[in-house]
Amino acid sequence: MLMPKRVKYRRQHRGKMRGQAKGGTTVAFGEYGLQATEASWITSRQIEAARIAMTRYMKRGGKVWIKIFPDKPYTAKPLEVRMGSGKGAPEGWVAVVKPGKIMFEIAGVSEEVAREALRLASHKLPVKTKFVKREEIGGESNEG
């Protein structure tokens, strides 16, 4: 399970999930990627489940990059506890994902295998996603 080694503060505000992703919107390491098309919190358990689904399908071939990291703690109060008396105890870790963010990248496998592996991974995630390919640098030109 992914989580930070140490944090300055144990509890954080929830924050807003407005707008598009600022960075990490292009396929940087691999050949194919899984891009979020809506905003959500993704827990460390969901990231791990998606990773396992991909690597199981690809057997031993290929390489996987996880481009998101759960660095935001979320809290929960125990069951049957009245409102008030402070914020709840830290329950787990989430990654804030906004539209356009590349969450996973794959290389070293064919496009069909990558497409199916990322489809299986997308079923483990609470966001709508799309399959993207790496844009070749200098592939198309507008000259002449």
From Swiss-Prot:
Keywords: Ribonucleoprotein, Ribosomal protein, RNA-binding, rRNA-binding, tRNA-binding. One of its GO terms (cellular component) is cytosolic large ribosomal subunit. It comes from the Bacteria. Transmembrane segments: none annotated. Pfam families: Ribosomal_L16 (PF00252). Binds 23S rRNA and is also seen to make contacts with the A and possibly P site tRNAs. This is Large ribosomal subunit protein uL16.
